[in-house]
Every structure is written in C-alpha cells, then in structure tokens.
Amino acid sequence: MPDVPRVMSTQHPDNATLPFFTAGEVIEGEDEIQEAYYVSSHLGCDEGMWDFEGKEGDNYAVKKLLSRYDDYFTDCRLGEGFRLTIRGPNPALEASEAKILLEILESIPRSYDAAALFADEHGLESVSPIHEVIVPMVTDADQLNAVEEYYRSFVAGKGSRSVWNGRTVEEWVGPFEPAEIAVIPLIEEREAMLRADEIVREYATAQDRESVRVFLARSDPALNYGSVAADLINKVALARLYRMADDVGIDVHPILGAGSAPFRGNLTPERADATTAAYPEVETFTVQSAFKYDNPVETVREGIDRLKRAELGAPPEPIDEDRALEIVDRTAAAYADQVDVIAPTVNRLSAYVPDRRARKLHVGLFGYSREVGENALPRAIGYTASLYAVGCPPTLLGAHALTDDDVTFLEGTFPAFFDHLRDAARYYNPRCTDVLDLERARLETPLELVDVEPDDGHREATDEVIDAFDRGDEEAVRSGIRRGARRRRFLG
C-alpha cells in the first residue's frame, strides 16, 4: 500500500462560494469528477473521498478520471500520487441503503480493470486505484469485518467459482483485483469513539492487519455534545488508540474530519499550522468544501502544503482522561439543555440554508438528521449555518458550564479551544436572543474568556436575517444567510 495520505479532500457541502467548475447552485454528478482532478492537480491534495453516504455517487469515477485527464494521471498515478477512497453507507444502521455498499464493493474490480487498461496503454505498471473503503457511524468491529470478508469472499473470491461446465468466473470475465481491501472505520458517536481502541484492536486481530487507518469525526460530535466536548472526546480517543497500538504492536494512522467553522474543527488554510499543532497525533486531515472554495486559490494551496509538510503522527501527550470526561459530561449536558430550547427555531431556519451538494435525506439516531436528546436536528452543516445566520456561534453553547478549574485544565490540555472560541465570537450578535429563547447572560459567559473585535459586516448580515425572519420575508432571510456565509468564508 502507498504511504498514508496527509490531506483528504471531501465533499462536505460547507462552502459559501460555488467553485468555478459548477454551473448551478449545487455540486453534483460530473462536477465531482472535475473536482477530483482539480483538488489533486491544482490544490495538491493526495487523497479524495468519493462519497456515497447520503448522496448519489458515480461508480465510474475511476474510468472517467483516467479517460478525461490521461496526461495528468500518467504522471500522478491514481492510487499512488492521488488516492481515491470510497465512503459508503453502514448496513447496520442504514438498512434502506445497505445494498448500495455491496454495489460499491462490486465496482472496485471494474475500476481496477479500467486502471490496468490505462496502464497497459501508457506502458505503465498497474496500480490499484482504490485501496480502502470508509464505513461511517461504526459502533463495533463486526461492521468492519463483514465488509472486508464480503469483499474477499464474495467479490474477489467469486473468481475461483465454477460458472458452467467447469469454467470459472475468472476464466469467463477475467480476474478480480485487488484481492482484498482495507476498511476505515469512521467513528462519530461518543461511546464508540471512546471505544475506538477496542474496535480497532478487534478488527486488526480478526483480519491480521499490521496497520489500520481510523477516522475520528469532529463535526457530528460537536453537534451532539458541543464543541469543547468534541475536542476532548477526540483527544481521549487518540490517547487510547496509541496506547492500544503500543500494547498490541500495530500501527494506527488517525484521520480527523474537521471543517472550517470553529464549531466543526476550525480547519482553514490560515489555521493549518495551528490545527496540526493541536492534533499532532493525527496523520490525515480532511479539507472540506469551504476550505477549498471560500479562500483564494494560492492561500488554499499554501494551507494544503503546510498540512502535508507538518510532522504528524506523534504519540499523544498524556491526558487526565477522567478529568477530561468530567468536563465532557458537564458541558454536554449544558449544551443539550440549550439545544432543547432552540431546536424548533433552528429547524425553521435550516429550511433557508442553501444546498451545496445533491443529497438524500434520511432520519435516524445517527442518520442524516441528527438527534440531541429528544430533538431531531438538521445535519451539522445546516445546523451550524442556521445558528450563525442569526449571530449565535454554536461554539458558545454549553461553554457557560466551564468552571475556572476547567479553564485551567483546557489551557494546559487543549489550548486550541480558546482559538476556536475567539474565532467564533467575532460573529456573535446579541440580538440572536430575539429569535432564540436563550438566556443572554449564559450565552455571553464564554465571551469573557477571550478578547475579540466583532465583525461589523457580519453583524449587519445577521441583523438582516433576524429582521426578515421576524416579518416572514423568506427571500431576505436567504439573502442574509448567503451574505453572512460569504463574509465568514464558510456556510456552516
């Protein structure tokens, strides 16, 4: 397998600005083929997530990339210089989409054939374009083992089976390559994240793997538990993963799924160095759509280059796990109390947030509409955009529960939280409580922890949304949401 990629381009729809290669309001279909080429050739990403989770994906992406951009992929081999990594649904939690995963797995040998034909035509050695599949919302190792075993036995394994008169499937239609694929668990829920070490150990042992890439979410934990809790859960999970790896004798290669909004990770081109310093244990970072399309191209290239050049994969610093999880419990409870109050308004506002990718909506505990307590919420990007639209950065929610001792602990354990808080607080508008039934004193308590100058242009945009929402002017609400998103350089 090639070296572990450092920068994974994803298709998360958090961008305020549309890229040059899309004609409409939504990135879809053939746009995403061009996007995969663009992020590799022009931006310098060394991996692209090809996403089938909650959206339509193209099973012929490899063939299209090689046929349209043959000169480029002659030099930058698909599968080596640029890795295409598929994300599919998790059958254990998405029953209505379960067979899509099987279709994805069946397409991998066909993609290999397309790449092998391309290599033969250009006098090159064959390289498998797809090495791994990401399975989302993982809660146990069985969900990973089933995928790997299905591919080995029922996809690649069918080649040796007799189809008629002693003739094997391989003799009939050709070999099935690669012989096996690895599975990357995407772990998003608190209890599963805190058991990530157990999940990875069981998977690595069952499949006799010496190394495992493990994908830790940053966005959905923030939606479910609040911003400070999301980072502390990740830091504890990473500490446990590395401890397990040392005990068992395997290598773990963590991926962090961070977005540009402070609430969703605060990974922007300007903050590339700060993010790698906050998470030196991580080897691969996601760059989502806002990172790529809401900043000048040269700034984006420089940010990606810094992510690639950073010294990453260091063992984590020791962390007092009990103390960290005590803060998680308290702030998550305070966060949930505030979300309980604002959920109906957030759901109304989310209807005005522009779509940036063609997606399908599913509802479930950890499905595409998320739940906090008893409340169904929009997906993380729509949720974040809705709150920013009225000047309520969600990083503030739950943070009023921090004690002085908690603040001291965070200063020593995860000082980046204060950067996230400072970057978010610029966009606070005290008038947000006109539409959100929140106690202003509690909402503003975290602001005392940072010095910040408010962004006047953004406040004007949020004033526009608040006033338009109050009078029922839907078009003005949409206009204000777009204006504010462009100002802060992310949608949600």
Tell what function each PLM region has.
Residues 50-135, 139-143, 150:
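Structured, charged N-terminal subsegments at the starts of enzyme catalytic cores
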Residues 1-52, 60-70, 80, 283-284, ...:
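Acidic, glycine-enriched catalytic cores built around paired aspartates
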Residues 190-193, 197-274, 279, 289-341:
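A cross-taxonomic marker for long C-terminal extensions/tails that follow the last structured domain
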Residues 73, 171-174, 244, 251, ...:
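Generic recognition of flexible, low-complexity loop/linker segments
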Residues 56-70, 100-115, 144-160, 193-202, ...:
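Well-ordered, non-membrane alpha-helical segments in soluble/globular domains
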Residues 81-90, 118-140, 162-188, 208-227, ...:
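Core alpha/beta catalytic barrel or barrel-like domain that forms the active/cofactor pocket
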Residues 101, 126, 178, 189, ...:
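Active-site-proximal structural scaffolding
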